[in-house]
UniProtKB/Swiss-Prot annotation:
Organism listed in the record: Vibrio parahaemolyticus serotype O3:K6 (strain RIMD 2210633)
Molecular function via GO: ATP binding; ATP hydrolysis activity; ATP-dependent DNA damage sensor activity; damaged DNA binding; single-stranded DNA binding
Organism phylogeny: Bacteria, Pseudomonadati, Pseudomonadota, Gammaproteobacteria, Vibrionales
A Pfam family that the UniProt record links to this protein: RecA
Function: Can catalyze the hydrolysis of ATP in the presence of single-stranded DNA, the ATP-dependent uptake of single-stranded DNA by duplex DNA, and the ATP-dependent hybridization of homologous single-stranded DNAs. It interacts with LexA causing its activation and leading to its autocatalytic cleavage.
Gene Ontology terms describing biological process: DNA recombination; DNA repair; SOS response
Annotated localization: Cytoplasm
Disulphide-bridged cysteine pairs: none
Principal subcellular localization: cytoplasm
Name the UniProt record assigns to this protein: Protein RecA
Gene Ontology CC: one annotated term: cytosol
Amino acid sequence: MDENKQKALAAALGQIEKQFGKGSIMRLGDNRAMDVETISTGSLSLDIALGAGGLPMGRIVEIYGPESSGKTTLTLELIAAAQREGKTCAFIDAEHALDPVYAKKLGVDIDALLVSQPDTGEQALEICDALARSGAIDVMVVDSVAALTPKAEIEGEMGDSHMGLQARMLSQAMRKLTGNLKQSNCMCIFINQIRMKIGVMFGNPETTTGGNALKFYASVRLDIRRTGAIKEGDEVVGNETRIKVVKNKIAAPFKEANTQIMYGQGFNREGELIDLGVKHKLVEKAGAWYSYNGDKIGQGKANACNYLREHPEIAKTIDTKLREMLLSPAQPEAPAAGEKPEQEEEF
């Protein structure tokens, strides 16, 4: 770039920063602070699948799946993790179905959690926007998009047609919310339901409610499915769950996490530590026995999990080592011309 153009660009950048504030425009490679802050989901395998160690702050996230697949459980686990870090959380309960007893069992501080049960979709989204603009909220959950009913539909007759009303409402809300969430570094999670497209012969007939705007504005989209039941004898005590990262703007997408959701407990963290520890040779398995650093920790997976629950310091050590091994490191700077990049170590 010639000198005159450089001067003109510098003047334009100075004018923009003076008018709109520092950081309103920057060179993409300049700012090392652009690393996205994340909050753990409560599941180690999902944190690893996301590539950044959790869900990103200041972004929109969509979680969808069939009924009883663990969508609300996942968001409550994330709220509990955020509260442990001292963050403020809000839950917009459009379905009017939040169970405070279950939330408390998952570790949510219900006395500190802000809850709203709005009457209309517009009211719910206005509350979201007001909370985002306040700058005081770190995590917001909207449960669910399908329950965000436009005011015109609520006030109309039962058989009235309201084509595209909800999609238009959401599209407008996304345009307003995105900038406010970024400025206040607040994460907004939308829980969504699945519907079937009529007349689809080829491809996936499943779609999510509320039009296409949310799909475009979301930085992360998670598809959560129940793949089986966990039994103790004849009693079902939990779900085998698969979570697929369908869209990811902060790391590589299309990775999957397999985990267990235990009824009344949430994610089986110790089970994940055992499985990932064995896979990556941090935990040794000989027959039915599991051992760590040469010490036996249990015969059978259930006993090994109980041992880790009783010894949280060992569980924490295994968790930290797995995160160091498996989470994507920050992108290294490009080598200078003529230099060879260092060989990356594979795990």
